[in-house]
């Protein structure tokens, strides 16, 4: 089997991709048997190509799965941890902009009664 391109795989359904992976795995096992029994050099070099092809198909499956999950959870309040943006622990614990702007009743009263003084500079 020739080297496959990821862009060719993206349009296919998951069942087709899984069947493709199974076919590639069967081919890989045949190539490994040929390696043990002393097969041709062309077959030995093909092992690497087939392994990479399997990885490529599985990568496309995982990417499409994650993309569908992102669409499903878009706009929802809670998301799975692996779909949330990656941040450090300290950043996750910071106050939000809204929380930073909140004031107690006492602070609101104080800012209303004693607002910031404005001075005019006489030139």
Curated annotation (Swiss-Prot):
Places the protein is found: Cytoplasm
A Gene Ontology molecular function term of the record: structural constituent of ribosome
Any one of the GO CC terms: cytosolic large ribosomal subunit
Signal peptide from the UniProt entry: none
Major place of residence: cytoplasm
Coiled coil stretches, renumbered: none
Transmembrane segments: none
Keyword set, alphabetical order: Cytoplasm, Ribonucleoprotein, Ribosomal protein
A GO BP entry: translation
Record's subunit section: Component of the large ribosomal subunit.
NCBIfam families xrefs: L29
Family in the record: Belongs to the universal ribosomal protein uL29 family.
Function: Component of the large ribosomal subunit. The ribosome is a large ribonucleoprotein complex responsible for the synthesis of proteins in the cell.
PANTHER family in the cross-refs: 60S RIBOSOMAL PROTEIN L35 (PTHR45722), LARGE RIBOSOMAL SUBUNIT PROTEIN UL29-RELATED (PTHR45722:SF2)
Protein name in UniProt: Large ribosomal subunit protein uL29
Lineage: Eukaryota, Metazoa, Chordata, Craniata, Vertebrata
